[in-house]
Amino acid sequence: MGVPFDYAPDRPEHIDAILNGLDRYNPETTNIFQEYVTLQCEEKTYDCYANLALLKLYQFNPHLTKDETITNILVKSLTVFPSPDFSLALHLLPPHILTPISASSSLPAAGDAPLSEAVQKLAVLNTLLSSANYSQFWSTLDSDDLYADLIADVSGFEELVRIRIASTISQSVREVASSELENWLGMNGEAFEKFIKEVCGWTIENGVVIVPLNKENEAKGTVVRENVKMEQFSRVIKRAYEQPA
């Protein structure tokens, strides 16, 4: 049985009480949720359900919106790819934020342009991760100072993304060239070897990274067998000869 969507192991009791009561629709809880987002960024925890609840409050109370909190939620959601959390958060934002500035029929209102640009840049990162274009993800992340500003509040962002990339890779391969994996993880040298051995628990032999066998990367044929009882088969034959009423 899978983990419920609204489950978060590190969620504080007072946040859980709000989410399971009518107060989740109370604008006065906005500050509490915003502080919780900050806590997630600092302590490397994550609570998608609470973050979406805050974005929903922003929908109903636009005057309470805090741009920095929105971008922090989006950045945190990148650390749990390939889950759909980024897209879920994106669809709770105002449409004008999602429209490219160059394609807008009119100039954005004061304060909208910076958030719109930030959201669209983060959407580019999400697309690269979702399409497994990991090398391009790291080069894009290093290409603009705005990216550095956006991820600054999220503690351990790069490490968390690398762990997710490694997890995804482990589901599809048994061996991969070290040089290729260095590009995918955006690191090299001693830092790369330390990450591979200590964090991933993999080994390196003659320039090749060996990924341990698991149920996802095991090349194993699947045989599907269905048992049909004779009485079931006879009913099918009988119906074929029955005259329509």
Swiss-Prot record:
Pfam families: CSN8_PSD8_EIF3K
Domain of life: Eukaryota
GO cellular component terms given for this protein: eukaryotic 43S preinitiation complex; eukaryotic 48S preinitiation complex; eukaryotic translation initiation factor 3 complex
InterPro entries: ARM-type_fold (IPR016024), CSN8_PSD8_EIF3K (IPR033464), eIF3k (IPR009374), PCI_dom (IPR000717), Transl_init_fac_sub12_N_euk (IPR016020), WH-like_DNA-bd_sf (IPR036388), WH_DNA-bd_sf (IPR036390)
Alphabetized PROSITE patterns for the sequence: PCI (PS50250)
Record Gene3D superfamilies: ARM repeat, domain 1, Winged helix-like DNA-binding domain superfamily/Winged helix DNA-binding domain
Protein keywords: Cytoplasm, Initiation factor, Protein biosynthesis
Subcellular location: Cytoplasm
GO molecular function ontology, one term from the record: ribosome binding
Function: Component of the eukaryotic translation initiation factor 3 (eIF-3) complex, which is involved in protein synthesis of a specialized repertoire of mRNAs and, together with other initiation factors, stimulates binding of mRNA and methionyl-tRNAi to the 40S ribosome. The eIF-3 complex specifically targets and initiates translation of a subset of mRNAs involved in cell proliferation.
Entry similarity comment: Belongs to the eIF-3 subunit K family.
Subunit structure, interactors included: Component of the eukaryotic translation initiation factor 3 (eIF-3) complex.
Protein name: Eukaryotic translation initiation factor 3 subunit K
Naturally occurring in which organism (per UniProt): Botryotinia fuckeliana (strain B05.10) (Noble rot fungus)
